[in-house]
Amino acid sequence: MEEMLESNEMIVHLGPQHPMQPGPFRLNLKLKGETIMDAEVEMGYIHKGIEKILENRTYLQGITIVDRICYLVALTNEECYVGCVEKLLDIEPPERAQYIRVILEELSRLQSHLLGLGEYGEFIGFVSMFMYTIKEREDILTLIDMVTGARVTHSYLRFGGVRDDLPEGFKEKTIPVLNKLKKVIRDYEEMFYSDTIYRERTIGIGVLTADEAKSLGVSGPVLRATGVPFDIRKNEPYLVYRDLDFKVCTETAGDCFARVQVRLNEMRESIYIIEQCLDMIPNGPIFPEGTPYGKRTPVMRVPAGEVFHRVEDPRGEMGMYMVSDGSDRPYRVKVRGPYYPTLQALPPLIIGTTVADMVSISGSMDGCTSEVDR
């Protein structure tokens, strides 16, 4: 983009603060009229140094740190981190604790998708969509808050279990919220399908093929919108997902419309998963019996070794590689977030399109800049 420009070309910098972005980053565009001729993404505006911070905190303190990788999906960040430590300790949470984790992580998936849908509607001029989704999201956050004591950054999971059991009356308060959300999802689809402008701004726009997605390491709804049925909850089940009945939602078009549809369908599956968990959850302890692990686990030394653990984040594959040297804090934690590979697909997708379509394409990826700049 640094070569000489033709007389009808110009460089435009979008960001680092721009209403259509999911967080601070700069998108440098080379334009000829309204057509994008070249594009590059510039990151690093909110780098937090989380991987280095984890090396200087005890394992228990690290739970609070990984919440900040992306506060929207703090529970799946915790699941990935805690899962690594549990592998090193060679322990498994009791069945009740596993069901509680799944319930909360699926509630987290619902609120994340609701926010993503609302923001996308706002990006493409469908402002009322944000008002609808944010209202439903509040109900989900209230349920999460009821269990964890926080709407975001929960610090709820513990090695071998969860901090607290489900409160009394949780099931009775959850079922009406889920039933209402089922109807609301149908309403969203009717709004989308009946809106000509929405269809024109999404169908056939920003098409990503399955081969392109796999070559870039894209995962999550963006990958499944290309027809690839890969979901870690199915392909490499963790917790009690292997005992639950749910579908991997896919579309084949690979465009903005398909990406939104995958998320809508995934919300239905998350509701179904939560309903199964509420019916199947057994009584019992929330920590392994006969072990020192509990709500206030003392400073502990984790056996030396190295592990990799990955989970299905609302945006794709969240993985962590952890190395222990036998001390009370990790020697190294390498985080593999879902949005960084997805962001690599943005420049090639928007080259040759218009600025207006660029906003639609970028928004359909449902990004989290905080996770990229960890």
From Swiss-Prot:
Principal place of residence: membrane
Localization per record: Cell inner membrane
Key words, A-Z: Cell inner membrane, Cell membrane, Electron transport, Membrane, Methanogenesis, Methanol utilization, Oxidoreductase, Transport
Thermal activity characteristics from the UniProt entry: Optimum temperature is 39 degrees Celsius.
Record family assignment: Belongs to the complex I 49 kDa subunit family.
Annotated function: Component of the F(420)H(2) dehydrogenase (FPO complex) which is part of the energy-conserving F(420)H(2):heterodisulfide oxidoreductase system. The membrane-bound electron transfer system of the complex plays an important role in the metabolism of methylotrophic methanogens when the organisms grow on methanol or methylamines. Catalyzes the oxidation of methanophenazine to dihydromethanophenazine. It shuttles electrons from F(420)H(2), via FAD and iron-sulfur (Fe-S) centers, to methanophenazine (an electron carrier in the membrane).
Quaternary data: The FPO complex is composed of at least 13 different subunits.
InterPro entries given in the database record: F420_dehyd_FpoD, NADH_Q_OxRdtase_suD, NDH1_su_D/H, Ni-dep_hyd_lsu, NiFe-Hase_large
Topology of this chain in the membrane: Peripheral membrane protein
GO cellular component entries: plasma membrane
Protein name: F(420)H(2) dehydrogenase subunit D
A GO BP annotation: methanol metabolic process
Disulfide bonds: none
Lineage: Archaea, Methanobacteriati, Methanobacteriota, Stenosarchaea group, Methanomicrobia
